[in-house]
Structure formats: structure tokens, C-alpha cells
Amino acid sequence: MTIMRKTHPLMKMVNHAFIDLPTPSNISGWWNFGSLLGLCLIIQIASGLFLAMHYTPDTMTAFSSVTHICRDVNYGWLIRYMHANGASLFFICLYLHIGRGIYYGSYSYMETWNIGIILLFLTMATAFMGYVLPWGQMSFWGATVITNLLSAIPYIGTDLVEWIWGGFSVDKATLNRFFAFHFILPFIIAAMAMVHLLFLHETGSNNPLGIPSDCDKIPFHPYYTTKDFLGIILLLAFFFTLVLFFPDLLGDPDNYSPANPLNTPPHIKPEWYFLFAYAILRSIPNKLGGVIALVLSILILALLPHIQTAKQRSLMFRPISQFLFWLLVSDVLVLTWIGGQPVEPPFIIIGQIASLLYFTIILAFMPIAGLIENKMLKW
């Protein structure tokens, strides 16, 4: 008798992806973040769907509709805070996932890596548009400042900004279209995640040693389903602690004031997960230069496979590159801190040094370290 999961057309796909998938026997907990990102996406789509049932994308009623959700809808406060903190959780997992990819050289799988970068851009776009929807002070001014950056594009900039706004300022048309895009993009992200998995399963997973593991593979189920389940339990414990005890920890108090175009907040800043890129943007005095640096701060990830000089894939046995990696992590944390500070000394110069260091580590120090390590190993 044939096993149904191996013959049924639909179940066969699930089987090849999650049950009988040959997986390296030595992948660590750092490989859990892919499945955790899938869980975050499910939480966001589910909670977002229920929020959309009660939300109205209109400048006059958007803020009060969010208040209505929190006060009058059954467990509306819970759904709202799950959605808001779910975004933070999504980005925590996302950055850890990318960090693991850099540390263990997973960027060698070019297709998977490039789809991942597209996923990062899509997620950032979705999160930005979602932040505009509650129509608080930081929603309005964040939308105004960030969309205005496009006006730095030569010749077409101003027209492009007005086209995105649907008028001459951020208004009802902007809010309406942002809601439409914010609703559809997570489904596009889900589809792209499938493509991400498809390309990954073409090559098989990387492993901490960064060496081929064809001789030592084990089935995904039950070994890694159990391991993923442990990750999911820990993630949910952290998530619900955040949602139920510290729901406003990562938010901005300014967003509890309704949007007012006549009153600018003292410090306009995006959510915490964009602060590192925002700090890079602010560290360049020129508007166009800042926008280019902002885009390159993410797009630079696409260069990693092309500027790798080391003969070893993983950083596991490369102490110089390891030091540079953790220096890069520290630098991103410094940039995140600077992004939330006002534009005044000494924060300006700290931000400029940290921004320069960010690009220098990736473009110069890491490739040079790879060559030095090759020499040390007489390769």
C-alpha cells in the first residue's frame, strides 16, 4: 500500500517541503528563524484581517476607529497590540535571520538570498504603510517625511511624490491607498516566501560548518519539526509577555495624539526597526546622497556573494572575520540608538562615524579579512 503523503499531488508538495526533506544533521537553533518568520506572517495576516473589519481608512475617522477597536470590540485591544508588536517581533526574527545568513555564508545561495532581499524590502514597505494607518501624529509626520524623500530624485521627484500622495499633501487619498497596499502586500510576501523556500530546497540548507552535508542528512520530520516547535513556544512566550505586560514599550507616545498637520512633533522618527537606516539617511547632509545611502544600506546585502574573498564559507573558524561581524552588529545597534536621538552634537558626528563604519566593514574590511585568513591557512 502506498503512503498517501507520497502520492497525493497536494500532500506530496507538503511532504517534500516539511516531512521527508533531507536536512543537515548539525543545523543549530539559528536555523529556526525561517519557520518563526512564517509564524509571524500568519499572526500578522490573521490579526490584520480582524482589524480591517473594524478600521476605516478615512482621515476623519481613522484615529477614532482604532480607539473604537481598543475600547468597544471584543478583545480588540488584544488584536491591535498583537498586530503592533507582531511587526516588531517580525523584524527581530528578520534581522536575526539575515545575521545568521551573513555569519554562516548562506548568501552563497544567490537565488534564495536575492529573494530574501526582495522580501526584506516588501516587509519594510508593508510596515511603513501600516504605521501610517492609525493616523496619529507620528503616522502623519512619518508618512510626510519618508514619502518626501522621493522628491530628491532628479527631474521626476516632485511629480512622483504628488502622485504617491494623490494630492499636494498626505491626506485622505494617501491613507486610503496605503491601507489598500498594506492589506495586499502580506499576501505577496507569503507568495514570495514560497519562492524563497522553493529556491532553498533546490540546493538544500546550509549548515554551521559551511561544508557539503549530502553524506549526513536526516529527515525534517520528526527531528526539526520538534525543534521548530520549541522555537515557536519560546517565541510565543516572549511575544505574549510583550503584548500583555508591555504593549507600548516599542511604540511612540506621539502616536496617541491624532494627526495634526499644523503641529509638528519635536522629533520625527520611524519605528525602532527602521532607526538604523534612518540614522544613515540623516548622517549625510545632502538630500539625494542621504536617500542613496538609505537604499544602499539594505541593497548592500546583494553585494555580499560578489565580494566574498575567503575560501571558507562560514565564519565559524575565521576569528578576524568573526570580530568584524560582531563589530558590524554593534555598529547597527549604535545606528539604531542614534536614529532615535535628536539631530544635535554629539549625536551627529557619532551617526556619521557609525554610518561610514557600516559601509567600510562590509565593502572593505570583510573582503580584506578573507584574503588575510586565506594567507594564514596557506590557501
UniProtKB/Swiss-Prot annotation:
Heme b b562 binds at residues 83, 182. Gene3D superfamilies: Cytochrome Bc1 Complex, Chain C. The chain crosses the membrane at residues 33-53, 77-98, 113-133, 178-198, 226-246, 288-308, 320-340, 347-367. It is a multi-pass membrane protein. Belongs to the cytochrome b family. It holds the Pfam family Cytochrome_B. It comes from Dipodomys nitratoides. Its cofactor is heme b. This is Cytochrome b. Keywords: Electron transport, Heme, Iron, Membrane, Metal-binding, Mitochondrion, Mitochondrion inner membrane, Respiratory chain, Transmembrane, Transmembrane helix, Transport, Ubiquinone. A ubiquinone binds at residue 201. PANTHER family: CYTOCHROME B (PTHR19271:SF16). The cytochrome bc1 complex contains 11 subunits: 3 respiratory subunits (MT-CYB, CYC1 and UQCRFS1), 2 core proteins (UQCRC1 and UQCRC2) and 6 low-molecular weight proteins (UQCRH/QCR6, UQCRB/QCR7, UQCRQ/QCR8, UQCR10/QCR9, UQCR11/QCR10 and a cleavage product of UQCRFS1). This cytochrome bc1 complex then forms a dimer. Binds 2 heme b groups non-covalently.
